[in-house]
Every structure is written in C-alpha cells, then in structure tokens.
C-alpha cells in the first residue's frame, strides 16, 4: 500500500529536447574570417586526430586548407598551425586526411590540387610541408593508409589524363610515395577501410567490395551488392575483432547497416539502426568509426550519434550531440566527420558551418543484459541507466531519495544515460522510468556509498 501511494504522489514535469545526451561539449572552434564554399554557409569538411608523445592533436579541413590544433590539459582546442591547400576555390568542399608514422597526408577532391605531406616531428610547435606534388594525385576524394603494409589507398582519383576508381601508393619511404597499381574493376570507389592488405571498398551504387593484393593488383574476395535499404554506399569501418563492419549509405532516411564479415564469402546484414531523432526520415548518416565495438557516426542533420555494437543483432544507442541546430530539412548541412581518440572518451567532430568540436564521452563500463538496469549499484555517485533497445528511446527519468522526494528529472533520448549524483549523500535512492511514447513505467532502487 505504501508503495502504491508513493507512485501516485509523484508529479511529472516535462523538459525540452536536449542538444546532447551522455556527451558534453569540451571545446569548440570556428573562424568567421574563413570564406564559405559556393552554398554560402559551409566552410569546413573532414576531421582527423593524432596522438604524439602523449599529446592529442586535432586536424580539420576548411575551404582554405588544413588547421592543426593541440588539445591542452584543460581539454581546450589551441590552434598551432595552418597549411594552405593547393586549391582554395569556392568549390573546395572535400579534403581528407590520414597519418602514418610522423607524417600527415592530405588531399582535396577539387582543384587542380595535390597530395600534401606534412612533417609532424616539430609538434607541438608547428608542422612543415615537405611534399606538395600533383604527379601521383591531383584530385582524390578520400584516402586510407594501411600502416601494416605501408600503403596509401586513394579513392576516386581525377587528373588531366582521366580518372580511376582506386590508386594504391607505396609509402614505405613516407616522404617519397611511389605508384603501385590502380584498381578499376568497379566504376567508383568513394571510400575505403584497409587492414593487413584487405580493403573494404564503398563503391556507391555497386555496394561493398572487399579486395586484397595479388601480384601488384587487386582481386575481389568478398562483396555485398544487394542488401536492405541500399543506397549510395558511402563509408564504413571494421571493429577491432575484424568480424563486424558498420556501413553508411549517404541517402535521406536510410539506416546504418551492421554486417557480419567473419566469412567474406557470405557477408551478412545483422541489423540496421538510425539516429532515432525526430527528423530521422530526413537524416543522412555520413561517416562512421568504431572503437571497442562502439560506433561513432556523423549525421548531417542529427550530429554525432553513438551506438554500442556489442550485440550486433541489437545495436544500442548510448549517446548523441547535435552540432547543427538549424533547419533539419536542409540537405547535407551539419555534421560531416568524426574522430574518436583511442579510448573513446574524447571525440573530434566537424560541422560544415560550425567548425570543430571536442566532445567528452564516458563509454559504458560494463555490458548488461537485463531489460533495464542501473550500474554500478552501489555506486560512488556516478552511475548509468541502461534500457533494452525494445523500449522507446524517448523517456523521462525521475530520481528520488528514500523519503520519496524528487531530486532531479532527466529527459532521455538514448538507450544509455549517465547520472551524476556525486553531490548527494550516501543512502537509498529510487529511479522511476516513464516512457514519453506509451504507458511503460517502472521503478528501480539503487544505493550511493
């Protein structure tokens, strides 16, 4: 009876949609003096990150070139250098980056442009361009470096002599790249993920191709040409166990695909997921990187979206941060690229209009399998609420002390929510979950030590 009265006496409040969930803004940079590209708004493009001598660095491209930042001890972005691109016209929309050993490689898909190689050995003070040449690469859409085999894969190449789908360079001498071979058995390669001489190629309308090298040429060892919600196969990333691959189709309203690639002769789609935001029918997943089975996805309209892929059959949304609060119907506006540092607690995100973001994130410390759970329990005041993916990701959490007094209320838009109760004393507390979509409600108890 007391339990029933306790429930009935609780009052419900409603708060507006939050820009972020489980993700915090640490630092943000933009430069109002930079000119936009031809659409009048977009200035920035790809983002990349490196760690050198224990210091984290951020790289972002703009219409004008490459901006390099240090992440200081206060988690603030400090710009330390800028490298002008060979091409800086109003059409300079696409730049891409990858690092190898002590060098940063940069390309542009408008031009005439070039391959630029920057020496990073003088960081944190400056960088220097030691190679800027268009003989091997004039225009390239994306690059990826297979560090184990010292090869640079250049996608969708264009030069005065024509174009080719994929070009592979030898960078075993990092400052003196040399040509190895072209791969043109597909019409187009938009992006690539390469590990140990095996390349997962995103081939637009031709789907996913997997190739490896044989006698200085590529042979196909796997493909997925037909799959649910197929569109323009744009980008993907392999997990650390090399058995799960997340794949984005760059089309309005198409879900991200989770693939089982343990058998390249029989690639299987295990699940699909999307941002679960209000404008999901218009949303476009652009790029993805996986760290420790957590997928960090950049969505044009919806910003950074974070999903736990520990169970590839049921991806769990565990965080988001919207970098673009403008009209969600604007096509291809907003978040462009994402780069989580190795442990996933700091994330770099680029927004086409709003520049570079450094975001903080606390990955789930454990995996739980019950429909809903609070962990750790008991805790020191920092704890996590986790719900089953089958429950709607639109809910309100009410926190009460042992006397039934409400202490806080949190709007949830993800399967996983961090709770900070460090300022509350030790004892018994209650969490009440209320769905904002249906009549689902439950109460759990937890303890603060």
Language-model-detected regions and their locations in the chain:
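Feature marking well-ordered beta-strand scaffolds used for ligand recognition
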Residues: 17-364
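Bacterial Sec-dependent N-terminal signal peptides
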Residues: 1-21, 377, 405, 441-443
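A general lysine-centric signal
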Residues: 2, 151, 445-448
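Low-complexity, Pro/Thr/Ser/Gly/Ala-rich linker/spacer regions in secreted
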Residues: 361-373
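C-terminal outer-membrane/trafficking sorting elements
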Residues: 370-375, 379-449
């Amino acid at each position: 009876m007391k339990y029933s009265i306790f429930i009935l006496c609780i009052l419900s409040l409603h708060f507006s949609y939050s820009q972020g969930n489980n993700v915090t803004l640490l630092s943000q940079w933009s430069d109002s003096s930079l000119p936009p590209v031809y659409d009048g708004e977009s200035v920035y493009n790809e983002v990349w990150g490196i760690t050198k001598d224990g210091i984290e660095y951020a790289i972002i491209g703009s219409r004008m070139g490459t901006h390099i930042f240090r992440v200081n001890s206060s988690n603030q972005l400090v710009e330390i250098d800028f490298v002008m691109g060979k091409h800086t016209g109003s059409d300079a929309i696409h730049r891409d980056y990858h690092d190898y050993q002590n060098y940063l490689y940069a390309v542009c898909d408008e031009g005439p442009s070039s391959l630029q190689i920057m020496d990073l050995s003088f960081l944190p003070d400056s960088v220097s361009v030691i190679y800027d040449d268009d003989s091997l690469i004039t225009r390239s859409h994306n690059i990826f470096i297979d560090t184990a085999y010292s090869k640079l894969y250049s996608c969708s190449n264009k030069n005065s002599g024509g174009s080719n789908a994929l070009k592979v360079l030898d960078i075993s001498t990092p400052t003196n790249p040399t040509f190895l071979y072209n791969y043109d058995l597909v019409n187009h390669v938009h992006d690539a993920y390469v590990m140990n001489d095996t390349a997962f190629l995103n081939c637009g309308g031709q789907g996913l191709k997997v190739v490896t090298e044989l006698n200085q040429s590529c042979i196909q060892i796997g493909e997925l040409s037909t799959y649910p919600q197929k569109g323009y196969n744009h980008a993907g990333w392999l997990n650390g166990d090399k058995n799960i691959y997340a794949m984005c189709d760059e089309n309005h309203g198409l879900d991200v695909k989770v693939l089982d690639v343990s058998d390249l002769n029989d690639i299987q789609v295990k699940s699909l997921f999307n941002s679960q935001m209000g404008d999901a029918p218009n949303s476009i997943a652009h790029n993805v990187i996986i760290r420790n089975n957590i997928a960090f996805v950049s969505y044009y309209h919806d910003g950074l979206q974070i999903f736990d892929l520990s169970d590839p059959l049921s991806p769990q949304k565990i965080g988001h941060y919207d970098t673009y609060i403008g009209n969600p119907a604007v096509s291809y506006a907003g978040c462009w690229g994402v780069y989580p540092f190795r442990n996933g607690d700091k994330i770099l995100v680029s927004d086409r209009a709003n520049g570079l973001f450094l975001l903080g994130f606390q990955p789930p410390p454990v995996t739980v399998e019950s429909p809903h759970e609070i962990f750790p329990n008991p805790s020191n005041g920092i704890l996590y609420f986790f719900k089953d993916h089958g429950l709607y990701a639109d809910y309100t959490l009410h926190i009460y002390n042992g006397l039934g007094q409400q202490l806080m209320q949190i709007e949830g838009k993800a399967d996983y929510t961090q709770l900070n109760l460090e300022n509350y004393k030790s004892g018994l507390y209650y969490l009440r979950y209320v769905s904002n979509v249906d009549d689902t409600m439950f109460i759990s108890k937890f303890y603060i030590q």
